[in-house]
Amino acid sequence: MEIILAEPRGFCAGVKRAVDILAITLKKYRNKRKVYVLHEIVHNKYIVEDFKRQGVIFVNSIRDIKDNRGILIFSAHGVSKNIEDKAKRKGIQVIDATCPLVSKVHKEAKRYEDSGKELILIGHKNHPEVKGIRGRVNNPIVLVQTLQNVRDLKVKNPDNLSYVTQTTLSTDDTREIITALKLRFPNITGPNLKDICYATQNRQNAVKKLTEIVDIVLIIGSKNSSNSNRLLDLCTARGKRAYLIDNYSYMDKSWLQGIEKIGITAGASAPDILVDELINHLKINVNTKVSVMSDGVTENVQFKIPHLV
């Protein structure tokens, strides 16, 4: 049996930056000040549970913070202006781990609003990134999730529209929605697919290639990870059997019956250790050869850690 690894896979620069910010902060203030994170630092169960064991306190609301002398970290997904203001009023020190690519969308949305445009956001309703983007502007943003939403859209002035997108969407689905928006509203302006993060696009392109050369795809990632779910959707859309699993223990041996080539990838918030554990588990159970797909993309993007850390 052959294992073929997608390239790239796993951590993106924004996730690595957020995880590093939290790790450095925890090391700096351990036994001195409590470290809080609003929501999950990234959408990965392993990462969150590991930080919990180290003493990080994850909260769902500013109200849940009991010690104002602590440090509050905003997750990689970003937050609304209202959340920022609440933290400021509480007087707690804040370190912002928002992915710079998400912050870029925040600025785009505000710039469009300041120019008088009515805003449309392509994204998933309950995702924290979407909540953050909607909360960066003063006026309501119309949310579009599907082509049907585009058909049903009611706007004030069809000639005065702009759109932005969540960074972790399917590039194929988003392209279709943008095309539909432009057909219905020819004067709409927006970034095309530039808001979708490079890492999301690279991982999706790698999985598309992977589905052509393997019999099954195993995707390491958590169920609440948007970009991991998009990898699963891509495999399914191409008729390739695929499973999204948190780690090797979720794998069912029956999945491998009659399989010669296994493709493995990982969402942008899944650490390398989980891929390594899956490979080792497979090696123990079956005779395997491991290789990396030959035409993958090497990523060299790095984001700076804020000076407060």
Curated annotation (Swiss-Prot):
**Would I find Transferase among this entry's keywords?**
no
User: Which residues are catalytic?
Assistant: E129 (proton donor)
Gene Ontology biological-process annotations:
dimethylallyl diphosphate biosynthetic process; isopentenyl diphosphate biosynthetic process, methylerythritol 4-phosphate pathway; terpenoid biosynthetic process
Return the similarity comment.
Answer: Belongs to the IspH family.
Query: What lineage does UniProt assign to this protein's organism?
Result: Bacteria, Pseudomonadati, Pseudomonadota, Alphaproteobacteria, Rickettsiales
Q: Know the name of this protein? A: 4-hydroxy-3-methylbut-2-enyl diphosphate reductase
Top-rank EC class of the record's enzyme: oxidoreductase
InterPro entries linked to this entry: LytB/IspH
* Protein EC: 1.17.7.4
Swiss-Prot/TrEMBL catalytic activity:
isopentenyl diphosphate + 2 oxidized [2Fe-2S]-[ferredoxin] + H2O = (2E)-4-hydroxy-3-methylbut-2-enyl diphosphate + 2 reduced [2Fe-2S]-[ferredoxin] + 2 H(+); dimethylallyl diphosphate + 2 oxidized [2Fe-2S]-[ferredoxin] + H2O = (2E)-4-hydroxy-3-methylbut-2-enyl diphosphate + 2 reduced [2Fe-2S]-[ferredoxin] + 2 H(+)
Question: What superkingdom heads the lineage?
Answer: Bacteria
Sequence positions that bind dimethylallyl diphosphate: H43, H77, H127, S225, S226, N227, S269
Q: Say which species the protein is native to.
A: Wolbachia sp. subsp. Brugia malayi (strain TRS)
